[in-house]
Amino acid sequence: MEPIKVISIVGSPRPNSRTAAGDAAVRQALMARGAACRVWNLGRQPLPLLDPDADEDVDCPAARLVVAVRQADAVVLASPIYHNSFSGHLKVALDHLGMDDVGGRAVGLVSHGGARSTQAVDQLRIVVRSLHGVAVNTQLCTDEADFGDGPRLIDPAAVDRAGRLADELLAFAAMLRDHRAAVALTAL
């Protein structure tokens, strides 16, 4: 069977961010379990604001992100906590995605900051639901104390949680991939 394909969308504009390091820990756990992973780091690959009246350029970064998400079985959304919410960078990316892109896909949530606050991931759950994605229950919320040099996730409980998130994401992604395939066959 083909490996589960996962795309991570990292919403931190900072190079070497702890948000990206938390996402990297989840991706490492996913790859150790056989998933094929790629990352779209919005700090290095920024997207323009959505202009719903603009002609769609199929080679623009936003169109490439849409294609990457559609090709994935699962998505990880990772964000720093900004003003008790997720980052504007991630919001811009989500504005470019629709129900046809995220719908029927498992979504894992990662955030960093605010004493492991869940505010960003709580709000992302609502956005994922509106896009008809399925946010898995286990999430990874980190703070400064969870990281060592690099930065690298080192807190044993946080590393364990990244592994549990990976397990859950892969289980849901496999079920949802099978469901999407069955629905596509009945549509023929």
Walk through the language-model features, giving the residues of each:
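A generic structural motif
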Residues: 33-38, 133-135
